[in-house]
Curated annotation (Swiss-Prot):
It comes from Bacillus cereus (strain ATCC 14579 / DSM 31 / CCUG 7414 / JCM 2152 / NBRC 15305 / NCIMB 9373 / NCTC 2599 / NRRL B-3711). GO terms for cellular component: cytosol. Pfam families: NAD_Gly3P_dh_C (PF07479), NAD_Gly3P_dh_N (PF01210). The active site is at K192 (proton acceptor). Belongs to the NAD-dependent glycerol-3-phosphate dehydrogenase family. Pathway: Membrane lipid metabolism; glycerophospholipid metabolism. This is Glycerol-3-phosphate dehydrogenase [NAD(P)+]. The gene is gpsA.
């Protein structure tokens, strides 16, 4: 039995805490809303972020991070990307022994364009890190909460660490594969949010299945192109954390990014969309970070660039579609060498 603290009590953190508790681990969960932590402890429910799901009574919730981290040997980080450094800076003052740091967040840090594992390694002293592991894949919290069949990937530089996390989570409804390509796994999970926003826009505009299929396919090309330039394995982007996550995020009403894009396509402003969502839409921040990365690394990402102009430069969504359709003619095979 592993003592593990889930840091972040949103929908995904809560669902993963449930998986770990189902597997018999000593599970604590921390959140910054005391009333929500009280509800988890007394009613065994997170009505704000995962309504209708009864949680295992063995999950203990804390609003004090210091109390939540007592004697743990593993932490699972599931907080918004913009909050990572603040949370990690608080945690490094509490943790005294080397532990395993797992993260299940899909985004790139705003401002630095760093992957989350890089942020962890920057903020946490080396003597407090046993391993850094990423858990990612096509996985809506709502379906995991219902214990519906889900498959994800555990990635780490040290394969033994990825396998240890695989053992922590794997059960009859939650299957875990391993992958040594931590760069590719993180980038696939983060960058697909951009394409999901764009897919929502195409649906909001009523452009049809042909346009959406093209968008997803060309979107995967962009993800692989930047991922390869940053050191990821091209095959990773054809797997669960690339194509798999892209499909589920672009086609499901559970997807916050798709829902946000759908509202944009129907004429709502970005401010209206974010206010109505009530939860973090990582794709918005990731679009900005990826656009900056693409320019810095001289990687062509036309869908990302078009979406960036819509989100941050006030470009009209219909004009963005026109700009993509009117691009210079290309050979498809020449455009996707990283996938061959």
């Amino acid at each position: 039995m592993t003592k593990i603290t889930v840091v972040g009590a949103g929908s995904w953190g809560t669902a993963l805490a449930m998986v770990l508790a189902d597997n018999g681990h000593d599970v604590r969960i921390w959140g910054n809303r005391p009333e929500l932590m009280d509800e988890i402890n007394t009613k065994h429910e997170n009505s704000r972020y995962l309504p209708g799901i009864t949680l295992p009574s063995t999950i203990v919730a804390y609003s004090s991070l210091e109390e939540a981290l007592v004697d743990v040997n593993t932490v699972l980080l599931v907080v918004p990307t913009k909050a990572y450094r603040d949370v990690l800076q608080e945690m490094k003052e509490i943790v005294t022994e080397p532990i395993t740091w797992i993260h299940a967040s899909k985004g790139i840090e705003p401002g630095t364009s760093k992957r989350i594992s890089e942020v962890i390694e920057e903020e946490i002293p080396e003597h407090l890190i046993k391993d850094v592991v990423v858990l990612s894949g096509p996985s809506h919290a709502e379906e995991v909460g219902l214990r519906q069949a889900t498959t994800v990937t555990s990635a780490a530089k040290r394969m033994e660490a990825a396998e240890e996390v695989q053992d922590l989570f794997m059960n009859s409804y939650f299957r875990v594969y391993t992958n040594p390509d931590i760069v590719g796994v993180e980038l696939g999970g983060a960058l697909k949010n951009i394409i999901a926003l764009a897919a929502g826009i195409t649906d909001g505009l009523g452009l049809g299945d042909n346009a959406k299929a093209a968008l997803m396919t060309r979107g995967l090309t962009e993800i692989a192109r930047l991922g390869r330039k940053m050191g990821g394995n091209p095959l990773t982007f054809a797997g669960l954390t690339g194509m798999g996550d892209l499909i589920v995020t672009c086609t499901s009403v559970h997807s916050r990014n798709w829902r946000a894009g759908n509202m944009l396509g129907k004429g709502h402003s970005l401010e209206e969309v974010l206010e109505s969502m009530g939860m973090v839409v990582e794709g918005v921040r990731t679009t900005k970070a990826a656009h900056e990365l693409a320019e810095k690394m001289e990687v062509e990402m036309p869908i990302t660039a078009a979406l960036y102009d819509v989100l941050f430069n006030g470009n009209n969504v219909k004009d963005a579609v026109g700009s993509l359709m009117g691009r210079v003619r290309k050979h498809e095979v020449e455009a996707i060498p990283d996938l061959l």
